[in-house]
Amino acid sequence: LRLDDNPALHAMAQNVESAAFVFIIDERWFAPSVHGFDRMGPHRMRFMVQSVLALEQALLEQGHELVILTGDPATCILEAANMLGCSQVFGQKEHTQEETEAENRIESVISAHWIEGQTLLHPEDLPMSLNDLPEVFSRCRNKVEKGGLKIRPLVHVEQWPIPIQVNALLFTGWLQRCESVLCPPVVPGAMVFEGGALAGRKRLDAYLWDTRLLSRYKETRNGLLGYDYSSKFSPWLAWGCLSARQIHAEVSRYEHEIEA
């Protein structure tokens, strides 16, 4: 849920003349898990809604609108493509079970291009195949570091495609469904994370540049209380508001300008 360093967006902008942007709230997010638990609690849903609204605003600043749908991803994509006159879709490649199943269903109804953009290292740049990844993190890290870190440069859209007009499409109801969780009760003193790429960037700047907490990470990383004993980048990474490559680029700049 970001525009900066978005390889899927970058690939789309280089290959199409006009485009529409669609975000799908998967209906399975509201269904209980196989063990009967909620898949998405109020805090996570609140973060998601904020992130989508932030993306919508960022797209408006580029002259584009965001179509927001709720339902089965393949069904929603096909309906939106038919209504918008689109013949292909671009999106970020996923690697988890339900997401790859959704990708397969989408591919069965429309031409789809899935672009790697979720990880720091592109799978093609790893010194081993995905099937040969070590099961222990430290072994994986050592193997990758010995092979040399091959991190691809950040990408940015220079020429935006012409926006497809979607004013006549009234896709409503999703915000009303989530409205009650926009401001869930918060225990005093609990950490509250604000969704969106801008909020993620503010946290990145605060942790590195405003407080230089990165320099004390080894001393504080085992903490359990408070906001600043670790980076707390995870919520923004999980929803794609920040990319791992953006963080790596800023950490590298920090090491060069402040402290290695």
Task: Label every model-predicted segment.
Residues 1-155:
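Trp/Phe/Arg-rich N-terminal binding region typifying the photolyase-homology
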Residues 131-260:
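Glycine/tryptophan-enriched, flexible segments
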